[in-house]
Amino acid sequence: MTKKLRRGYTTGTCAQAATKAAVTMLLGNVSVDQVTVSLPGKEVLTLKIAEAQKEFNKYNKSNPEIESVSCAVRKDSGDDPDITNGILVYSKVSRIKSGIVLDGGIGVGRVTKPGLDQPVGNAAINTVPRQMIVKEVSEVCHLFDFQGGIKVVISVPEGENLAAQTFNPRLGIKGGISILGTSGIVEPMSDKALLDTIAVELKQKRAEGHSIVAISPGNYGLEFMKRTYGYDLERSVKCSNFIGQTIDMVKELGFSKMLLTGHIGKLIK
């Protein structure tokens, strides 16, 4: 009997839960050991808070006010072989005059090339996690009838070291990992995750103005192109075994030409 693989939750869900806990502690002056969050796919998760720390206003010793709160949630990727499994995702929140300001801190990448989910200069916190985080802040502010604003900074202390093992440097995301997730759940051994990455790379090449793209199942074809023809690998995309799906994406994105290269045995398999 085949073992059912265990699902996990995304870095976006970790950031969402850590933010909810931190804002609750900031505005409610309470301790929080765990939080329950609703995910975009309507699932509900209860996650433990791995770390929590309050910082007080040191200039008001007679009646110290909480200046900021930092909470962390530990990432659980389930049975998916994800390098981010077990890392701590932190959210530090503080009061501001108005609005909700969200940014990335240590270990969260910064976008340096066009064509990605976020504009150049933004922290690599994708749209859905941003929405999840802002939703939690808004709801907690409403709960405590807080009329001011909140600043949220998401950090991943291990993020900069881990980023070298991801697609981020190739995509132009510098300094850390991305805060990701569309459903909030990590599906183990997901083909969709790899297809999504291929789509992001192709969209980026198109946004940079390239009309011709080289694709290859792996390193063999790309190294051949570089060694034999001096081809710029910044204009290429690895497609693994998803050659057909990648060709469909190339067509949909409006590239005028595509070059497919690879080991003959791999291509005809």
Where does each model-flagged region fall?
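A structural signal for small-residue-enriched, beta-sheet-centric alpha/beta enzyme cores
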Residues: 6, 171, 177, 182-269
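Generic N-terminal targeting/processing segments that precede catalytic cores or assembly contacts
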Residues: 1-165, 169-171
